Amino acid sequence: MIKPRTPPGIMELLPREQIAFQRMLDVIRRNYERFGFLPVETPVFELSDVLLTKSGGETERQVYFVQSTGALANAAAAADAGGENGGLPELALRFDLTVPLARYVAEHEHELSFPFRRYQMQRVYRGERAQRGRFREFYQCDIDVIGKDALSIRYDAEVLAVIHAVFAELGIGDFKVQLNNRKLLRGFFHAQGVVDAEQQALVLREVDKLDKRSAEDVRATLMGPDFGLAEDAVRRILDFAKIRSVSHADALDKIDWVVNEVQSRSGGNEDLHAGADDLREVLELVKALGVPESAYCLNFSIARGLDYYTGTVYETTLTDHPQIGSICSGGRYESLASHYTKSKLPGVGISIGLTRLFWQLREAGLIQGIAESSVQAMVALMDETRLDDALDIARRLRIGGINTEVQMEPKKVGKQFQYAARAGIRFVVLAGDDELARGVVAVKDLVREQQFDVARDELASTLQVELEQARAMLVAGGVQGD
């Protein structure tokens, strides 16, 4: 007999946790749609040459390839015969949603309306080294706005407003969207003598590690043989990376201070001024969108490690749980699909890694206030002769919007109560001879441990009221129900 087990790096949930996870998905989807984003799904596997066109190194080593048993047999036979095995398998599982989006937009470019606003919430796969909190299969929940030839900076502000709406409704605690601009970073580094674009990208990666490594470690790296930066330049870079704003007005002041500081030393440069102008406009529009200033700040150490970001960058953290790290990140890029089309397709987007976020919230005890079951009521079967009545009551409840289960075989009432309690079902509906003769049913509320009679025709509306009251009480307790 084979021992039942799952591979490492998989998060498999019991029903109660799956309900909580699903409700988080629903909150994210609902807010994406409120802002006018359209759903897209792409295949779980793509053609290998399409998926890997711009990857390499670590990414390619983490890709899962897909091969049929027939193809495997043919490859093995070819190898046994001393021939070539044909190279990489034809298909590979997606490792993120960005590359499939690039392929999708390039392939359907002439069928889409631009700016194209898309959301995508699907599993992705990476061959991560097995360790606690790292997953090989995980959900990503992405939005992107894609332009044709150009895309207004105003969308960068709207994306931040989406982040705020999502996490405000999730109710998992105070959070902060941290904001920066890669152009401003490049301009600042240029003023410190880091002129080469490739070296700037490497310095950006080091600055982006400041939340994981000490400033002294980063200082030593930047002054070491790989970078060889002067001590004064490194000091100014690290001082710059410490800058945080505490209010909307302070953020604008900090931008002006950085620009003036660089101008006084080197006269400024185009990237610095362009990045500063973009940040100012984003901040003013974020305010106009109604995002409270307590929910966002400037953080000049935010760089995002991916090189394709060219402007605004975001990282979101939980204020009371900084150890969780970034719970949502993204930014602006200038050419989404340059490997698939000659068209220029700039965009801005963010991604929520929901599987890792859910796991961390569960570990921190922040997944609260969730019903144990998606079933809201159970109709008990008192005896065989009342099956038709039980089915009719269940039908009426479902029409009234109540998720309802029916006991299909008569059992002792105590056993039916026990089953409902273990399954996390709140209401048990009893329809015996006495109740039916009076035109009512009895309802047992297993949460309040109360029993009451309700007219048969008013059962669904009565339970709806009870459930709405329960939802209202849970709003402050964690992720909200539907």
UniProtKB/Swiss-Prot annotation:
GO molecular function: ATP binding; histidine-tRNA ligase activity
Protein name per the record: Histidine--tRNA ligase
Gene3D superfamilies linked: Anticodon-binding domain (3.40.50.800), Bira Bifunctional Protein, Domain 2 (3.30.930.10)
GO biological process, alphabetically ordered: histidyl-tRNA aminoacylation
UniProt keyword annotation of Cell membrane present: no
Compartment(s): Cytoplasm
Top-level division of the source organism's lineage: Bacteria
Main location: cytoplasm
